[in-house]
Swiss-Prot record:
Family from the record: Belongs to the class-I pyridoxal-phosphate-dependent aminotransferase family.
Protein name: Uncharacterized aminotransferase C6B12.04c
Originating organism: Schizosaccharomyces pombe (strain 972 / ATCC 24843) (Fission yeast)
Keywords: Aminotransferase, Cytoplasm, Pyridoxal phosphate, Transferase
Gene Ontology terms: cellular component: cytoplasm; cytosol; mitochondrion; nucleus
Enzyme class: transferase
Lineage of origin: Eukaryota, Fungi, Dikarya, Ascomycota, Taphrinomycotina
Single Gene Ontology BP annotation: amino acid metabolic process
Cofactor(s) needed: pyridoxal 5'-phosphate
Subcellular location field: Cytoplasm
Presence of the UniProt keyword Cytoplasm in the record: yes
Molecular function terms, GO-annotated: 2-aminoadipate transaminase activity; kynurenine-oxoglutarate transaminase activity; pyridoxal phosphate binding
EC number: 2.6.1.-
Stored InterPro entries: Aminotransferase_I/II_large (IPR004839), Kynurenine-oxoglutarate_AT (IPR051326), PyrdxlP-dep_Trfase (IPR015424), PyrdxlP-dep_Trfase_major (IPR015421), PyrdxlP-dep_Trfase_small (IPR015422)
Coarse class of the protein's main subcellular location: cytoplasm
Amino acid sequence: MAFRGIRPSNKVAASRPDVWTLVNQATAECKVPPVSLSQGFFNYNPPKFVLDAAKKSIDEVACNQYSHTRGRPSLRKALSEAYSPYFKRTLNPDTEIVVTAGANEGFFSVFAAFLNPGDEVIVMEPFFDQYISNITMNGGVPVYVPIIPPEEGSVKPVSAGAWKLDMNKLRNAITEKTKMIVINTPHNPLGKIFSEEELNEIADLVLKHNLLVVSDEVYDRLSFVPFVRLATLRPELFKHVVTVGSGGKTFGCTGWRVGWLIGDESLIKYSAAAHTRICFAVNSPCQEALAIAFGEAEKHNYYEEYKSSYKKRFEILAKAFDQLEIPYTIPDGSYYTMANFSKLKLPKDYPFPEEIANRPRDFKLCYWILKEIGVATIPPTEFYTDEDAPVAENYLRFAFCKTFETLEEAARRLQKLKDYF
């Protein structure tokens, strides 16, 4: 009998090629190496004090063995000391913090801990695409509520804060099956920071309907405007919010895969239980290195210099967009910006591959700019449902977590677009 293959789970069988695979494949096929402003990883090393901490940790005997399933005590203590002032309470490192294998495993652990089949999770569009698979693999049902772009965003630069959550749709999206809401602030891909007014409206609904919130705050150290945490708005909210953080985003070491969850003991104990079954423990030397890094960051004035350098990085792209008269979002936080290419005229009969030709216009923009201009970006309709994708089909997402030289070269190459307006 001929071998017919093993059928995959329905959880993955229906998956179409994701945007990361498509962009990476197209990038690899380029004759001239493109400048990559696509994925949100850094193309330079973490600061020396962070690297020194990692080198020191790898020589420690205990750091080469399993850590406590909830995370190394040194890192949980460092996180408590670093975040207690922001949460306006003393965070218990033993019961209110758990270290995870990157922020993504943190999300997965919360969904695994609290979702039953058919439970609904409200997700705001555009969304980080990993949310969706994490929800559905744990039996949840995503329900989408759009963040609406400002009308003037297609003709001039606008603040990311001008993109507004449709509160009426959020209210109407809540049903008896709703279990959770996912919030991302500072937002990927918009760079939006939700205002205190917006968060209070969300808080009213959370308390009224007894909902759990997963608050993705992995870019919290890159906030260029006042940053408010939902969990701190009212004392009772702490028991409704699990906050997700990232060592990789905070210190420029995304490959270390160390994240964390912060929340009330009643939430963390179940998330920690799921985390233990998913990966048992997180790599020890990188945890210890981050514990040291948190302790030394203020001494090196790291956070202020981090923000200052990213404002300068964004200014390189903003200047290039201004020269091209391309509208863009001015981020409130994070290291992403969205630029609007509605005026760019794609050549007729361009040979787009089938997997690109059948997708919205931003995929074609992304592919063409990659192949002809040599700059890699991300098409943001990947972060929307098919129904709402037209909202973003003229935009591209740029990640500016790159060296100044990389950004300057990207800006130079982008000037070639003048011939296509």
